[in-house]
């Protein structure tokens, strides 16, 4: 049986009174083992279907052939688990579902015939099978324990001396256990029934005194079933120990649907913590089974419930789960969540083994091997006499086994496992040198307790059980709870004649569980030395008294007399004077103690007299809810007005705290060192989370949404433009913690804060699928930012659940999104993929923008260079005309009216008359002047040609002119376009001169390209010379050109520097090398405006 999956069954109950009053519709249907649910808000969508091991339809009556009764549920699940318990396996059955879904009814049931739940039927069947299997070699023993887990505290329900919370510990051999939890020996089903009844009474009394609700606590009823077998051949005793755990989980409900607030909301948070941890454990185990993630970390110790159920979930146990469903459409979200929970659970596989002694296991395996070999020999035709001889030898060997067998090897304690990052202490002697004396003493005492408990005989256990039973009866008698004539405590029965009080509780399982007799004469109620002892905040030492006075006609009249200052209500009205009670009256003492007065004899006499019932009691059942509603109505308390007043107070408080947060954020924005948007948003996120979380502790998510929408979120007052492009995430600093030591829990909390902030900024328009996608995206982003692994695969699910619990989801949008998506986790995965694709698209766009920044810069450089080059031919034409005319034209001063009038003519090139066909040199010269693209290409070619000739010439031939004609152009290896700028020191010498010495040596043109003397030619560009100041330069450019500035015409174009970037004018050095200088040059108006144009005229030494 090892390696079997968890058995999962779902059961749907009938409508309750609340659902019937609201005209609820059934949205759950079952066909065989398939359960389907329809979204009431998206009725056109296909229903979601789930398949389980069992689907029980209990929505109708017993006349329906499809109706599943309590007996059928036990036959399918209970009998199978009980069979595993007899085989020696651990067994666990737990019920899960929302409050009021029928978990307690399925597990415990009622006292009426045919209404018993799984637990009573299993206990009764256990003892019936034990009585049927009695033999001399077999003996059985049964021990039970009953505990309650409320707000992460463990309470023993069978030990009246246990007052506080018990500690949960983990032994490396025994596993998790509750320290000092009583285990009582029982010998019959009646003993178990009495103990269960006592446990329920203790649970009811404690819940009433502390104003608790049993539906908010987990109940665990454990049966330890031991089978001892004596082997006559070996003379050894073997034991098989089975642990049967029957768990009734607390209700999984939403705070907004239950109206919880204050302490109830805190209880719900603890319930959600335990149930959420249970969901995490189930998800982690399911992922391990599906081979999605192999992780050794299972968060068992995150809650007491999962810690105690560690062996039952994925461990050494046979486990079954019953999911209780509500069929109403108003509970659609809770029902769908329960179905998904159950669907996840069925993927878990448990590795159960038989719990028996090692020697017994060895002997059993050897006996099975002998039987198998004997059958093999018989099949091969071995004679019967030979088999008899083998039997004789086998018997002699078995007889010698006790003498030669070694003692059982001690079970070596396994190494302690690591949970939540801390090492669980072990009992191995290697660690005793590392612990302190106090811890060593505590471990020693605990080990001695365990040894004493294991060595305790059965008779001692029975005596201990009897002593505890007497103590419980004495305690109940002291409290005024009725006791049977045979000494057993009261179950659910009503006396025939005696007037009495029966308790009412919010949980139906705890209603009518306590019965208080009203004796003849005076019965006092209070806290100390009273006939009926009650405790609580509003119960006085002497609260009230009941007078039972017989009348002459035989009728007994009971009168209630309240004490001064004590709050006592009858049928919702405050009682200040003695009042005669009628059967069926509702009595409220203090705030928490609610009773119904029953007078059987009075009711019988009224029926005999034909007295009509009073008009007061309604047709609905008189339970705790009716008593509370009646109390509020009679006291004139309008629940709606009270809730509105409370909401207004909370809204005013939120508004005040928001204003304080706004002032704080504004101060931080003004005086902080950094005023970036990220820092401001981060501070706003933290303040928003603080206010929303404090508000959520007192109100449901829907009300929180209303208040936040109305009042807004804290802000520093600085408006931020919406970001259109995905920004690469920067590392955030976690509040109060070094990011280097950030854990996965810190990242989850940070993700919850940021997602809640984003959802609140969007006016809570996010649906369930959108929140899941945000959670997955945010967790990946944070893990990548902080260098953490992606963590558990369902980490984003926990984040999404926390966001739902905090801010809820869109009203109707969440259900719609859930209905339109794929079933279960598929829809979330699709949304996750979509969000991931959007994120990758954004990152790709950002990378494109970053990579194209240099291209944009180069394009801007090219555009500006083209605009500058349009000026260069004009300056060259003016220079040619001036030199051909032999005089320097007058240039008006800069800024004068003449300069403004001359500017348009300077910009336009002068018209040239048509000329005869040009030679190749003239054509090249014309293109160099008129075509900037041709000029750039030819200048680049000349530059490469000069460098090549300079390399060929060598160091010895640089004194004279170059005589070799230019050869074929060899393109360089690096053809990247370069822009030498005069303002950059590294580029000033990028085109060095070809000659050596103080004066540059011009190149002589080769003979092949020497122009014909008869052909008129324009003056080619002058060779590279030293810089000369312009007319508008800072060092005075008004000097006239001398006569010695004439130069012989060079035969080759020399490359010139040109600048495409406008640069501010820089002063030239005062000391210049001696030599002839050019006459003053008038800068064109466009160049004067740019102020950074390259020098178009350069001064050079005369050749």
From Swiss-Prot:
InterPro entries: FHA_dom, Kinesin_assoc, Kinesin_motor_CS, Kinesin_motor_dom, Kinesin_motor_dom_sf, P-loop_NTPase, SMAD_FHA_dom_sf. GO terms for molecular function: ATP binding; ATP hydrolysis activity; cytoskeletal motor activity; microtubule binding; plus-end-directed microtubule motor activity; RNA binding. Residues 5-348 form the Kinesin motor domain. SUPFAM superfamilies: P-loop containing nucleoside triphosphate hydrolases (SSF52540), SMAD/FHA domain (SSF49879). GO terms for cellular component: axon; axon cytoplasm; cytoplasm; dendrite; endoplasmic reticulum; Golgi apparatus; kinesin complex; microtubule. The modification Phosphoserine is found at residues 295, 494, 674, 676, 915, 1033, 1092. Residues 1092-1103 have a biased composition (Basic and acidic residues). Residues 523-590 form the FHA domain. ATP binds at residues 97-104. One of its GO terms (biological process) is retrograde vesicle-mediated transport, Golgi to endoplasmic reticulum. Disulfide bonds: none annotated. Residues 813-822, 953-962 have a biased composition (Gly residues). Phosphorylated on tyrosine residues. Residues 1062-1083 have a biased composition (Pro residues). Residues 359-388, 438-479, 633-674, 828-872 form a coiled coil. The modification Omega-N-methylarginine is found at residue 1041. Its main location: cytoplasm. Residues 1021-1031 have a biased composition (Basic residues). The modification Phosphothreonine is found at residue 1083. Motor required for the retrograde transport of Golgi vesicles to the endoplasmic reticulum. Has a microtubule plus end-directed motility. Monomer. Interacts with BICD2. PANTHER family: KINESIN-LIKE PROTEIN KIF1C ISOFORM X1 (PTHR47117:SF9), STAR-RELATED LIPID TRANSFER PROTEIN 9 (PTHR47117). It is linked to Spastic ataxia 2, autosomal recessive: A neurologic disorder characterized by cerebellar ataxia, dysarthria, and variable spasticity of the lower limbs. Cognition is not affected. This is Kinesin-like protein KIF1C. It comes from Homo sapiens. The gene is KIF1C.
């Amino acid at each position: 049986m090892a390696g079997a999956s968890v058995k999962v069954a779902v059961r749907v109950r009938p409508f309750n009174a609340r659902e019937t009053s609201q005209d609820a519709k059934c949205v759950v249907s079952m066909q065989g083992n398939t359960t389907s649910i329809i979204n009431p808000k998206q009725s056109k969508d296909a229903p979601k279907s789930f398949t389980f091991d069992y689907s029980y339809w209990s929505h109708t009556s017993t006349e329906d052939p499809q109706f599943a009764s309590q007996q059928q549920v036990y036959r399918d699940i209970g009998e199978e688990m009980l069979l595993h318990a007899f085989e020696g396996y651990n067994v666990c059955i737990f019920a899960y579902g929302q409050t009021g879904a029928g978990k307690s009814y399925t597990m415990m049931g009622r006292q009426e015939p045919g209404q018993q739940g799984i637990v009573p039927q299993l206990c009764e069947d256990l003892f019936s099978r034990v009585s049927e299997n009695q033999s001399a070699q077999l003996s059985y023993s049964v021990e039970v324990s009953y505990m309650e887990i409320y707000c992460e505290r463990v309470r023993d329900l069978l030990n009246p001396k246990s007052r506080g919370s018990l500690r949960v510990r983990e032994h490396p051999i025994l596993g998790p256990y509750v320290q000092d939890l009583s285990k009582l020996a029982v010998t019959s089903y009646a003993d178990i029934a009495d103990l269960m009844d006592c446990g329920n009474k203790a649970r009811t009394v404690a819940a009433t005194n502390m104003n608790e609700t049993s539906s908010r606590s987990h109940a665990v009823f454990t049966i330890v079933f031991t089978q001892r077998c004596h082997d006559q051949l070996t003379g050894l005793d073997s034991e098989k120990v089975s642990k049967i755990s029957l768990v009734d989980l607390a209700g999984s409900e939403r705070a907004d649907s239950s109206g919880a607030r204050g302490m109830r909301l805190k209880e719900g948070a603890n319930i959600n913590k335990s149930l959420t941890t249970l969901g995490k454990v189930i998800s982690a185990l399911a992922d391990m089974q599906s081979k999605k993630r192999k992780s050794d970390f299972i968060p068992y110790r995150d809650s007491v419930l999962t810690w105690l159920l560690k062996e039952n979930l994925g461990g050494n146990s046979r486990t079954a789960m019953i999911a209780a469903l509500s069929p109403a459409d108003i509970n659609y979200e809770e029902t769908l969540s329960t179905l998904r929970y159950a669907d996840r659970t069925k993927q878990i596989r448990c590795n159960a083994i038989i719990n028996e002694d090692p020697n017994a296991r060895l002997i059993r395996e050897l006996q099975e091997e002998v039987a198998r070999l004997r059958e093999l020999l018989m099949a091969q035709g071995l004679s019967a006499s030979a088999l008899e001889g083998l039997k004789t030898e086998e018997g002699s060997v078995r007889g010698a086994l006790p003498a030669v067998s070694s003692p059982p090897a001690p079970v070596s304690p396994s190494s302690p496992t690591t949970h939540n990052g801390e090492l669980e202490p072990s009992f191995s002697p290697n660690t005793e040198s590392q612990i302190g004396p106090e811890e060593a003493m505590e471990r020693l005492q605990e080990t001695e307790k365990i040894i004493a408990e294991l060595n305790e005989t059965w008779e001692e256990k029975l005596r201990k059980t009897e002593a505890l039973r007497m103590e419980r009866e004495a305690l109940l008698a002291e409290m005024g709870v009725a006791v049977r004539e045979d000494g057993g405590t009261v179950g659910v029965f009503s006396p025939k004649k005696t007037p009495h009080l029966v308790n009412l509780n919010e949980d139906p399982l705890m209603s009518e569980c306590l019965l208080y007799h009203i004796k003849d004469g005076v019965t006092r109620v209070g806290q100390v030395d009273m006939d009926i002892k009650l405790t609580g905040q509003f119960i006085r030492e002497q609260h009230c008294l009941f007078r039972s006075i017989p009348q002459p006609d035989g009728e007994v009249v009971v009168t209630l007399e309240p004490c001064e200052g004590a709050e006592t209500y009858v049928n919702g009205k405050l009682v200040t004077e003695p009042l005669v009670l009628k059967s069926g009256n509702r009595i409220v003492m203090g705030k928490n103690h609610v009773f119904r007065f029953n007078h059987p004899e009075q009711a019988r006499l009224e029926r005999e007299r034909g007295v009509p019932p009073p008009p007061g009691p309604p047709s609905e059942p008189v339970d705790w809810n009716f008593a509370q509603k009646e109390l509020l109505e009679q006291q004139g308390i309008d629940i709606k007005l009270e809730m509105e007043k409370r909401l207004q107070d909370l809204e005013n408080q939120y508004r005040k705290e928001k204003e304080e947060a706004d002032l704080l954020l504004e101060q931080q924005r003004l005086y902080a060192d950094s005023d970036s948007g990220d820092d401001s948003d981060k501070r706003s996120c933290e303040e928003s989370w603080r206010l929303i979380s404090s508000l959520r502790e007192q109100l449901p998510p829907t009300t929180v949404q209303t208040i936040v929408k109305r009042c807004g979120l804290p802000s520093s007052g600085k408006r931020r433009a919406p970001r259109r492009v995905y920004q690469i995430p920067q590392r955030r600093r976690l509040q109060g913690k070094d990011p280097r030591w950030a854990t996965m829990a810190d990242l989850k909390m940070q993700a919850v804060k940021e997602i809640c902030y984003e959802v609140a900024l969007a006016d809570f328009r996010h649906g369930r699928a959108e929140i899941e996608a945000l959670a997955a995206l945010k967790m990946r982003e944070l893990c990548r930012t902080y260098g953490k692994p992606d963590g558990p695969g369902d980490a984003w699910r926990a984040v999404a659940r926390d966001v739902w619990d905090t801010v809820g989801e869109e009203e109707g949008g969440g259900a719609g999104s859930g209905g339109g998506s794929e079933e279960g986790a598929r829809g979330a995965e699709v949304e996750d993929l979509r969000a991931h694709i959007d994120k990758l698209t954004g990152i790709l766009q950002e990378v494109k923008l970053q990579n194209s920044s240099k291209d944009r810069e180069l394009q801007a450089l090219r555009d500006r260079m083209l605009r500058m080059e349009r000026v260069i031919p004009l300056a060259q034409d003016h220079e040619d005309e001036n030199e051909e005319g032999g005089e320097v034209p007058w240039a008006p001063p800069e800024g004068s009216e003449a300069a403004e009038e001359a500017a348009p003519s300077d910009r336009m090139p002068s018209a040239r008359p048509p000329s005869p066909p040009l030679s190749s040199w003239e054509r090249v010269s014309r293109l160099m002047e008129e075509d900037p693209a041709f000029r750039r290409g030819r200048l680049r070619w000349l530059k490469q040609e000069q460098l090549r000739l300079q390399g060929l010439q060598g160091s010895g031939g640089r004194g004279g002119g170059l005589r070799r004609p230019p050869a074929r152009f060899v393109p360089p290896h690096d053809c990247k376009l370069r822009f030498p700028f005069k303002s950059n020191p590294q580029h000033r010498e990028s085109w060095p001169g070809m000659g050596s010495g103080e004066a540059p040596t011009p190149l002589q043109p080769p003979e092949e390209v020497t122009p014909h003397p008869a052909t008129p030619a324009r003056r080619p560009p002058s060779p590279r010379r030293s810089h000369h100041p312009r007319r508008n330069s800072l060092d005075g450019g008004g000097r006239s050109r001398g006569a010695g500035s004439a130069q012989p015409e060079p035969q080759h174009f020399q490359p010139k520097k040109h600048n495409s970037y406008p640069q501010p004018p820089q002063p030239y050095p005062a000391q210049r090398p001696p030599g002839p200088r050019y006459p003053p040059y008038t800068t064109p108006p466009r160049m004067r405006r740019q102020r950074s144009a390259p020098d178009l005229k350069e001064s050079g030494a005369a050749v």
